[in-house]
Every structure is written in structure tokens, then in C-alpha cells.
Amino acid sequence: MSIRRAGTLIAIRELHGIAEFEQVSELFDGIWHFDPDSRPITVELMRAMSHAGNYVAGAYDDAGRLVGASVGFFGAANTLHSHITGAASGHGVGFELKLHQRRWALERGIDRITWTYDPLVRRNAHFNLAKLGARPEEYLPSFYGVMTDAINQGSDSDRVLASWSLSAPHVAALVRGEPCRRPLPADAAVVLADEDGRPVTRDSDASTLLVALPEDIEALRVADPGAAKAWRLAVREVLGGLLVEGGVVTAFHDKAFYVVERPSLGTASSSDRV
């Protein structure tokens, strides 16, 4: 599969050889600067996963340089779990990799892809929810324990599990390039706000709630670790709490707020479901 992005021809294909997996490992190291003793994926594991029929793919520019890669494995029924995806910024490679992954899954009768991401990173939330149409299903506190890579170093590794329903109408529309924006209800209320860079929680009985994120959590971790930790705990409490109660994240508004719909009266919370 080949596409043209920002004037560059990008070819995406499945990978099978050791030399290709070594290129992927180098690409990922260049993005995350992993501790050599705690890499999330190794050359040997990519080889085994590819041989077993899982998803290992790379994106190459017209000069033959690897500019993106993605690794996923079969999980629950009819589900592919995307373990790691990394790409050079600025060329839309990450989006094209996800579309390739979607086509690959649908060809195999898979209708759902899941992955985890840091719920505090605005650009990731916008990409996952607004561009792809995925929806957060579960809040996972300190999912990977304390991480040591250059981006996450020293931070609690809270994640949300994103679920991508590949054949959902809103996903199909986004894939076709059609925006799916719904206006906020007039009574939508902010329950986590950003006030001078600090998180402030608010009470509300509204059915549509907005959960703010910091402008740049990665920069904040370096400039003000205390504020970064305060945001982590606040989002864990507010967004995580709403998901546990059965709230549904329906959008990411204005590149800054999760939009959460409260469950209607009589709807069981996640802890009550069989």
C-alpha cells in the first residue's frame, strides 16, 4: 500500500525479516530513547509475533527510509491489540499506519482494535478520538508501573484503553475524511478545569461533563513535576471515576476536553455489570 503525504510517497507493508525488525527497533529508540534493559518490544519478539501471524508493519518513504512502524497481537475475540505504534512527526504517517492496520484487521474478520495511551497527552487524545473515532473504555492506573524512557521517565504510567470499532458509522466517516463533530449541549459542565496551569475540580449534576487536560503534560513534567503529578491524580480521580461509574467518553472537544456522558438513571455501573 502506497500513499502520498506532504509531498512524500509512503509505502506501508508487513515486515518479516530480522533486518527489518532491527530498523523498527532503531526507529522506536529514536522516538522514546528506551532503557536498553526495559524495551517494550524486541527484535526477537517481533520475529516471533510476525511468524505467528500477528501484525508487524512498517512505513517507508520514497528514499527507502523507515519512518513509522506498528506492532499488534491478537487479543480477545475478534480483537487486535495494537501494542506500539511510532512514526516520524509531520507527515501523517501515524494516521496512515492506523488505516493500514484497520484494513489488515477487517480482511481477517476482526472488527475491533484496542490500544493504550496516556490520557494526559492532548495530541494523543485528539488523534485517537477526533481523527480515528476510538473511544476510551477503561482507566488503567499505573498500568506499566514506573517507566524509564525519556518521555515518561519517573511518571506514573496511567493509561486508558482505547477501543476502535472498525465498522462503526462514525469511524467509517472519519476514514473517508468526513468530520463527525456534534455541538455540545448547552448545559455541558466542566468538572475538571485548567486554572493557571493547575487542575481544579468542580461539582455538577449535568449529564454532559467536560474533563480538561493540561496544555503540554510532557513539558510540565520537566518544568514543574509537582503540577504534573497534580494533573495525573486529578485526571485519574475525575475521568477514571466517571468511567468506573459507567460514563461514556464520546468526543475530545476543542483539542482540550474529554466529553463524558453520564449514564442514565437505572444504568448499572461497570462494577455492577455481570
Please provide the spans of the model-predicted regions:
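Short amphipathic alpha-helix that is part of the acyltransferase structural core
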Residues: 1-45, 50-51, 58-60
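Conserved beta-strand in the GNAT
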Residues: 56-58, 64-73, 81-83
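A conserved beta-turn-beta hairpin within the catalytic core of GNAT-like acetyltransferases
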Residues: 74-82, 206-210
